[in-house]
Curated annotation (Swiss-Prot):
Organism ancestry: Eukaryota, Metazoa, Chordata, Craniata, Vertebrata
Protein family membership: Belongs to the cytochrome c oxidase subunit 3 family.
Catalytic reaction(s) noted: 4 Fe(II)-[cytochrome c] + O2 + 8 H(+)(in) = 4 Fe(III)-[cytochrome c] + 2 H2O + 4 H(+)(out)
Mitochondrial matrix side: 1-15, 67-72, 153-155, 224-232
Protein name: Cytochrome c oxidase subunit 3
Regions annotated as coiled coil: none
Encoding gene per record: MT-CO3
Domain of life from the UniProt record: Eukaryota
Gene3D superfamilies according to UniProt: 1.10.287.70, Cytochrome c oxidase, subunit III, four-helix bundle
InterPro entries, sorted: Cyt_c/ubiquinol_Oxase_su3 (IPR024791), Cyt_c_oxase_su3_dom (IPR033945), Cyt_c_oxidase-like_su3 (IPR000298), Cyt_c_oxidase_su3-like_sf (IPR035973), Cyt_c_oxidase_su3_a-hlx (IPR013833)
Gene Ontology process terms (BP): mitochondrial electron transport, cytochrome c to oxygen; respiratory chain complex IV assembly
């Protein structure tokens, strides 16, 4: 065994970056096959490979940080910077969608009748399901903060309770969004309004599903006593991500549902 004289974690050789890249190739190729040839076999193979890769890669990270003690304070600081950069990239990702929406809505083209929303499109009422969804996500922001404070104070029971409520609120939000899509009178093919609406809200919904899964993993880990009051970056990263999802929804609600309608 080699002996290191520094606090950094030298990662062991791993096959997961290779299988992750392969799964990305399979998924993108599978999407093309699905769109043009109506075959989902390659897409399902890519999704399966991707899920298996993520599970085993994050399993290794949990082992290294929780059981082997490789996540020293300086490593945790690096992970924090990495998460901040990741969330920053996500902010820019959604900025592109908001830019497309405002570019189209502030100066509607003659093809749209120089009017927004376009003629023939009947927007959703912002005071119905969208307002309920806003309340649900704001409540989940409160409960995830409650969970974080409970963890810092060493109250495991309250932390688990608050985290479970947050996960249930995330699932409830997703179900409401599905109901909203089902009831909408327009589709993604209804011009620029339909495409910007469904792409922006759809990607946000995907982030809610990812965040709910992230929190569910944290819940399972806490059941196994993985987190302490001074060693819980996995949960902290999930909380940051969830707050980011909340803030994006507020901008989305005010821009697309309220002002855009």
């Amino acid at each position: 065994m080699t002996h290191q004289m520094h606090a950094y974690h030298m990662v062991d050789p791993s096959p997961w970056p290779l299988t992750g890249a392969l799964s990305a190739l399979l998924m993108t190729s599978g999407l093309t096959m699905w769109f043009h040839y109506h075959s989902v076999i390659l897409l399902l193979l890519g999704l399966t490979t991707n899920i298996l890769t993520m599970f085993q890669w994050w399993r290794d990270v949990v082992r290294e940080g929780t059981f082997q003690g490789h996540h020293t304070p300086i490593v945790q600081e690096s992970l924090r910077y990495g998460m901040i950069l990741f969330i920053t990239s996500e902010v820019l990702f959604f900025t592109g969608f908001f830019w497309a929406f405002y570019h189209s809505s502030l100066a509607p083209t003659p093809e749209l009748g120089s009017y927004w929303p376009p003629v023939g499109v009947y927007p959703l009422n912002p005071l119905e399901v969208p307002l309920l969804n806003t309340s649900v996500l704001l409540a989940s922001g409160v409960t995830i903060t409650w969970a974080h404070h409970s963890l810092m104070e060493g109250s495991r029971k309250n932390m688990l309770q608050a985290l479970l409520i947050t996960i249930l609120l995330g699932v409830y939000f997703t179900l409401l969004q599905m109901f909203e899509y089902y009831e909408a009178s327009f589709t993604i093919s209804d011009g620029i309004y339909g495409s910007t609406f469904f792409v922006t809200t759809g990607f946000h919904g995907l982030h809610v599903i990812i965040g709910s899964t992230f929190l569910l993993i944290c819940f399972i880990r806490q059941l196994k006593f993985h987190f302490t009051s001074n060693h819980h970056f996995g949960f902290e990263a999930a909380a940051w991500y969830w707050h980011f999802v909340d803030v994006v929804w507020l901008f989305l609600y005010l821009s697309i549902y309220w002002w855009g309608s």
